[in-house]
């Protein structure tokens, strides 16, 4: 009787962990740098296509492509940060939205031209296929892998941004750039590193997403909605908030599609509205 419920809960948590990896980078750049980057999921799409290309064209092992997906998205983001984004740090939100949504449209067109409009499969290693039994439940190995990756990312991000010199430099640069420069902090390099980190995590998420939700050129817009919901519900700049929001949205989405498929994705929007009415700054947002 309870097995289907626990099965849905497990799938929802695993899906939520995928959404967390996709969204936490935007939470960092938007919350800490106050930059609205609607091209965030374009970097996720880039990471996914890097993995597809390396696996299908060059016979790389799937796991070996994950660092490359992170690195490719990070490098491209640094190039864009130095040439385009940096000019708009002090611009209005509308200017930032127009630039980044334009970049997202461009990325979709390029992906469709190069890779086509259909989803492309990728072969995962044998160790991540199938399921393992636990208390009468069949837990997918790949979903367990996703949960493990998300937990590692969470620990590394919290440690890096809260307890290291780099994290202190990022916060100082955001609060007062002039004072930060006076203290010897290279603000431009700090912002570029932060952008690379956020976009690299998106690239990693895009690579991990292929096995669960597939990848096509519309990915940049389809999952941008989920990412923005998680960042809003969790609270800007809060890693813990994004983690909690991702679990909440993931479980709500999977449960809604399983128990009330006629509602579609309506349930996650309802959850978002209820949470933001209760806590307008998000679950762990700054008031």
Regions found by a protein language model. Name each.
Residues 1-22, 50, 61-65, 91-97, ...:
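Membrane-interfacial amphipathic/re-entrant helices at transmembrane-helix boundaries
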Residues 2-18, 160-165, 191-233, 253-265:
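Inter-helical junctions in multi-pass inner-membrane proteins, predominant
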Residues 10, 32-79, 83:
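Membrane-embedded helix boundary and interhelical linker motif in transport proteins
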Residues 15, 134, 138-215, 239-245:
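Helix-loop-helix "hairpin" substructures at the membrane interface of multi-pass membrane proteins
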Residues 26-47, 62, 90-96, 166-169, ...:
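Short, non-helical or kinked segments that cap or interrupt transmembrane helices
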Residues 59-104, 110, 244-249, 279-280:
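Alpha-helical transmembrane segments within multi-pass membrane transporters and channels
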Residues 83, 114, 175-182, 186-189, ...:
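Cytosolic-side transmembrane-helix boundaries in multi-pass membrane proteins
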Residues 88, 92-163, 190-193, 255, ...:
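Transmembrane helix-bundle core of multi-pass membrane transporters
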């Amino acid at each position: 009787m309870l097995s289907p419920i626990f099965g849905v809960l497990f799938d929802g948590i695993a899906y939520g962990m995928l959404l967390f990896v996709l969204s936490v980078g935007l939470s960092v750049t938007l919350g800490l740098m106050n930059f609205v980057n609607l091209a965030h999921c374009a970097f996720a799409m880039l990471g996914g296509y890097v993995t597809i290309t390396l696996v299908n064209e060059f016979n790389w092992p799937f796991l070996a492509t994950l660092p490359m997906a992170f690195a490719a998205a990070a490098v491209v983001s640094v190039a864009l940060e130095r040439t385009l984004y940096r000019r708009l740090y002090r611009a209005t939100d509308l200017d930032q939205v127009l630039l980044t949504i334009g970049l997202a449209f461009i990325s979709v067109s390029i992906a469709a031209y190069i890779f086509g409009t259909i989803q492309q499969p990728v072969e995962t290693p044998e160790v991540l296929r199938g399921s393992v039994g636990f208390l009468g439940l069949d837990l997918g190995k790949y979903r367990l892998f996703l949960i493990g990756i998300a937990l590692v990312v969470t620990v590394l991000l919290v440690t890096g941004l809260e307890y290291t010199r780099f994290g202190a430099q990022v916060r100082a640069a955001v609060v007062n750039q002039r004072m930060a420069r006076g203290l010897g902090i290279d603000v431009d390099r700090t912002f570029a590193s932060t952008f690379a980190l956020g976009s690299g995590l998106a690239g990693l998420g895009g690579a991990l997403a292929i096995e669960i939700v597939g990848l096509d050129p519309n990915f940049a817009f389809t999952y941008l909605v989920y990412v923005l919901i998680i960042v809003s519900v969790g609270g800007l700049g809060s890693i813990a908030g994004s983690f909690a929001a991702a679990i909440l949205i993931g479980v709500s989405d999977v449960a809604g599609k399983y128990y009330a498929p006629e509602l579609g994705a309506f349930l996650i929007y309802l959850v978002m509205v209820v949470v933001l009415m209760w806590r307008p700054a998000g679950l762990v947002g700054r008031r």
